[in-house]
């Protein structure tokens, strides 16, 4: 008899949880594109046995062999020796939402299958590290190298996520690419940098990766930043400008409180990733005895357009930061976006060619009017 193994892109033991009280024993993400499978009764028992390496006990159990065949069809059991998605054990959920926890594991497996280095930032890990009181996040934030965001976004299509591309995608202007949740109900933000960190994206990723540690999500080992580095990320999130508005007193106090909780090591790390312009005041408040002056610090490249309230002016300022060779394509997409870009912006371009063209013409006319009004 071939040796059976439990395979999965994420799995949780639900016994003792609210879902367990409803009769579900396990939830397992198949090792191929599909929705999570909820197991109970004999199916859960057999799957757990092969996950524990006890498949040999089932060799003469005809009922168990039929169950194994069904599990194989579901994509959660395999007779392939050394399967890349073989699971050795199953953990219980520690996130408020088990489905969100499965998304972390799924992303880690999909990224590994495409040779993409991936880190997970913000979210429940901040709560676990004592850096925020809120436990749950509505989406999952991950961080990859520039260019890998597009590869990961396309790889996640088959799992039900849709990338929301913008005219600035791939130019370095946008710091993340959002993947629409679909049936999973959990959006994903794929970061290639973080606002306020002004070191080159590849270099900052390397620093964050070096300052990360393993954390298990849905039976899968993932990487999240250590406390000090994660404190910098959380503080930057608090103080970044939003639609023309700079950080106010509440945001500055929130950032300083996070940095204080993360420890004095954040000063050196902020200097290493070049986040001192954005964090100078919060760092001074958090650590007055160790306060340093950063008079030569320059605003991050995206701070200018983030502080611009007018959408046309914001687009123009952002356009100035785009490499020259990419500007024509960005201008074209700003004026004449793809249907997917219009839908991502919340517009309804219609289904007919005529309606789509009319919507685009209306956009061009509106853009011209706004530009003339700026004069």
Q: Where does each model-flagged region fall?
A:
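Conserved NTP-donor binding/palm subdomain of two-metal-ion nucleotidyltransferases/polymerases, i.e.
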Residues: 1-138, 144-375
């Amino acid at each position: 008899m071939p040796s059976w193994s439990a395979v999965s892109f994420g799995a949780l033991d639900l016994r003792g949880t609210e879902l367990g009280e409803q009769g579900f024993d396990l939830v397992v993400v198949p090792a191929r594109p599909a929705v999570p499978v909820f197991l109970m009764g004999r199916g859960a028992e057999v799957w757990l046995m092969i996950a524990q390496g006890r498949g040999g006990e089932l060799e003469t159990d005809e009922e168990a062999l039929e169950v194994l065949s069904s599990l194989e069809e579901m994509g959660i059991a395999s007779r392939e020796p050394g399967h890349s998605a073989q699971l050795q054990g199953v953990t219980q959920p520690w996130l408020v939402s088990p489905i969100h926890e499965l998304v972390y594991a799924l992303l880690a497996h999909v990224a590994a299958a495409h040779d993409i280095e991936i880190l997970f930032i913000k979210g429940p890990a901040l709560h676990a590290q004592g850096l925020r009181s809120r436990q749950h996040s509505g989406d999952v934030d991950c961080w990859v190298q520039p260019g890998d965001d597009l590869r990961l976004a396309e790889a996640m299509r088959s799992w039900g996520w849709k990338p929301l591309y913008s005219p600035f995608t791939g130019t370095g202007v946008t710091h993340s690419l959002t993947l629409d949740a679909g049936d999973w109900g959990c959006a994903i933000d794929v970061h290639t940098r973080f606002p306020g960190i002004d070191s080159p994206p590849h270099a900052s990723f390397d620093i964050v990766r070096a300052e990360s540690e393993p954390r298990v999500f849905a039976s899968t080992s993932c990487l999240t930043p250590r406390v000090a580095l994660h404190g910098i990320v959380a503080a930057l999130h608090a103080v970044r400008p939003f639609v023309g508005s700079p950080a106010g007193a509440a945001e500055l106090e929130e950032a300083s409180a996070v940095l204080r909780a993360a420890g004095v090591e954040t000063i050196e790390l902020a200097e290493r990733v070049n986040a001192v312009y954005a964090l100078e005041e919060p760092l001074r408040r958090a650590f007055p005895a160790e306060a340093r002056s950063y008079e030569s610090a320059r605003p991050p490249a995206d701070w200018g357009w983030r502080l611009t309230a007018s959408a046309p002016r914001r687009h123009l300022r952002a356009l100035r930061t785009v490499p020259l060779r990419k500007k024509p394509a960005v201008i074209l997409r700003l004026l004449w976006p793809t249907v997917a870009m219009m839908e991502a912006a919340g517009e309804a371009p219609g289904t007919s060619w005529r309606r789509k063209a009319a919507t685009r013409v209306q956009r061009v006319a509106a853009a011209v009017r706004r530009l003339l009004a700026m004069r």
